[in-house]
Amino acid sequence: MGKLMKAAHLTSCRALKASNINCPDAIITATSRGMLDVSMQFLEDITTNEEELLKPTLFMQSTHNTLGSAIAIRSKCYGYNITYSQGDDSLMWAMRDAERLIKTGKVKNVLVNLFDECTPIIASFAERTGADIPKELCAKSFILVRN
């Protein structure tokens, strides 16, 4: 289990525990870049193994919705579960979706997550272009509740 997955589990557990909710009605995850470290490992395996005898685990864990799915499995949440991956706008769309679900009465509570990581190669790209270097790891979870 990579750093981001561990951080995702920890922050979501803390948010659920703090709100006395065992199973959220919905899980909405936002990510700008997804699980880059696992994606890079998968691409390296493709090159190293010449596209043969690849392990499916890295591929399955490289998709953006892996984090939200893992949290749903752990919390036994079989309801609404979606991941937004629209770059810097991901959290905004996740919050709008959570607000919509609550306002329409479809759910009473929503676990909203923001997860991202920065690999050394992404940091070097950012540095070369003069952009701000993203944090190595970002894992935040919070609960929105209908009154």
Give the positions of each predicted feature.
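Conserved active-site "lid/cap" helical segment
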Residues: 1-28, 32-39, 97
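Acyl-thioester C-C bond-transforming condensing/cleaving domain
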Residues: 21, 34-147
